[in-house]
Amino acid sequence: MKQLFATTARGFEELLKVELTDLGAMDCQITQGGVHFHADEETQYRVLLWTRLASRILLPIVTCKVYSDLDLYSAVVGQNWLDYFDEKAHFMVDFNGTNREIRHTQFGAMRVKDGIVDYFERVGKPRPNVDKSQPDIRIHAYLNREELVISLDLSGDALHMRGYREDTGKAPLRETLAAAIVLRSGWQLGTPLMDPMCGSGTLLIEAAQMQANIAPQLHRLHWGFDFWKGHNQQAWDKVKGEAIELAEQTFNQNQKANFYGCDLDHRVLQKAKRNAQNAGVAHLIQWQQGDVAALKNPFVEAKGTVICNPPYGERLGTTPALIALYSVFGQRLKQQFADWNVSIFSGEPALLDCLRLRSHRQFKAKNGPLDCVQKNYHISARATASDENTQNSPEIDRTLTSSQVAVDFANRLQKNSKKIEKWAKQQGINAYRLYDADLPEYNLAVDRYDDHIVVQEYAAPKNIDENKARQRLLDAVTATLQVTGVETNKLILKVRQKQKGTNQYEKLANKGDYFYVNEYGAKLWVNLTDYLDTGLFLDHRLTRKMLGEMAKGKDVLNLFAYTGSATVHMALGGAKSTTTVDMSNTYLNWAEQNLLLNDLEGKQHKLIQADCLQWLARCDRQFDLIFVDPPTFSNSKRMEDSWDVQRDHIKLMTQLKRILRPNGTIVFSNNKRGFKMDVEGLAALGLSAVEISAKTLPLDFERNKQIHNCWVVRLKADL
């Protein structure tokens, strides 16, 4: 009996132990990342040939303590390597783990290699060659703190490399992981198994090989034991011969084609067919090109299992298309697969919530570096009937009848859309708000920018369960897609939290996707993906229009200008000159592009990058019209002092008065809820203010009276 160690992905140790026991292994002991076991020669070969879950099968040679690189070298050079292989065999070393002295795995591998070749020289043999591409012998070294285990890798290439997969799609599963998913799915041998997003077919092929009694390594040509002196060819031939005989017997039983794979991509489906042919299970699997939205049950008379590894994104904010995909998938499952079991493997648990199914079992697993989850469900006949009843519900519009998701939200969004879109067309605008937290349960905003939709989630209150808030967001995205009919790649999802300083201007992506929208004759660039904001504050639309109407023949200043959209309106309104000041180079360049887009060029349009307050203190020219829309609060590193609009607005007005011409006007706005203008402070400066907030709220923002406040400030002497 030999002591061996089977490695596997973390989370699969218990499954592997069961498999090894079934294959005849003895004394199986689970440890992190694998299972220790004992086996005689035939069982050893049977495990190598039949394991579907192990990554490698290792034969430990040396176990020792390593406190220095000398300890490592001494342990290796003192081993009798001729007991394992001769000098003609090419070898390589895999080294995993570090400690305080052995800090790099490459260094560890080099010292093991040195010890082996030096041993051969010491006993008067030629140095064996190192071959990292196709070695005859693979030495595996694992260092955990001070404990070193050196093993002979009997597998050779990793055991997930079955040999049948010649090509894959964009996101392939390792075969060992696929086998584990199948085993955890609850699927029973002999019953139908369907994968509606099968990709290169790995899940179905692994399951089909189980049903066909095909050993996963049956066609492997090279093994790690081929040049091992302890290899027993007779025992190996016996075990392999038994496996071949079992596969042939099963093949002759005329098994039904109980496996069914679908995918939207016909090219990857062709690869799946070739993979199945290579794996010897092509006769068991039917393939069909198709969309999940039209998914049908091909096994109407039977009960089986749907298994799937659908696509998933690393970041929720980049996956509105996936939200729609999972939502539609869940609907089709309930409509088509009554009394079936379903098992879904995903790297984004939130997306699984879009299925709107209740799992009865779930497992955690790793797919490479990604933390993933596998959830098992049962589609009851009652759930199927409920979904059918929802389709016939008279309470919601026919555009929504494909889903029971967020009905209240969907109805409100649809009602708002009918009203606002008609008004927007009359106004000559194509960027506007459709929904703004109208319902407390759906705390988000929905904005249209031409043929794009932006869904912005507001930060949920602390007393709201995070999972519930996320589920509502996902439901709202699904409903938004259905109501608006927007293409999934033109829906942008953003998570908005309370702002701190100027972090609203932090970059989120670098796609550079700009397009322009129309606003009362002005064309304005927007970017929906790269920043938390889009480059256009929609609630200030009427303010910009008013500024344009006030600007004719005047020298105008836009302070805290952002992307200069107000400057564009004032310039188009006939301003004599414009001065645009902002601290951000990015947004100042954006402002310049906005001017150019509207054919506004010339020396009369000045763009100044500066700390606005410092620039204002130095400014020595005067203006007829000043628009100032400062942040509520800022503590930017590029500013000398912090800024608070409530605390500091009189200081700001003091400086603005200095550069305001007689009969001039200041339009002052901010977004601080509950802002109180210091009327007495203004009076002491010789200024008076009239609030015009209600007049600057457009129809699409009338439900949010406090989104901004706006004031017209003039010199008292001019009144």
Swiss-Prot record:
Keywords: Cytoplasm, Methyltransferase, RNA-binding, rRNA processing, S-adenosyl-L-methionine, Transferase. This is Ribosomal RNA large subunit methyltransferase K/L. Specifically methylates the guanine in position 2445 (m2G2445) and the guanine in position 2069 (m7G2069) of 23S rRNA. Gene3D superfamilies: 3.30.2130.30, RNA methyltransferase domain (HRMD) like, Vaccinia Virus protein VP39. It holds the Pfam family UPF0020. Residues 43-154 form the THUMP domain. SMART domains: THUMP. Its EC number is 2.1.1.173, 2.1.1.264. The gene is rlmL. CDD domains: AdoMet_MTases, THUMP_AdoMetMT. Its main location: cytoplasm. The keyword Cell division does not apply. One of its GO terms (molecular function) is RNA binding. Belongs to the methyltransferase superfamily. RlmKL family. It is found in: Cytoplasm. It is an enzyme of class 2 (transferase). One of its GO terms (cellular component) is cytoplasm. The keyword Magnesium does not apply. It catalyses: guanosine(2445) in 23S rRNA + S-adenosyl-L-methionine = N(2)-methylguanosine(2445) in 23S rRNA + S-adenosyl-L-homocysteine + H(+); guanosine(2069) in 23S rRNA + S-adenosyl-L-methionine = N(2)-methylguanosine(2069) in 23S rRNA + S-adenosyl-L-homocysteine + H(+).
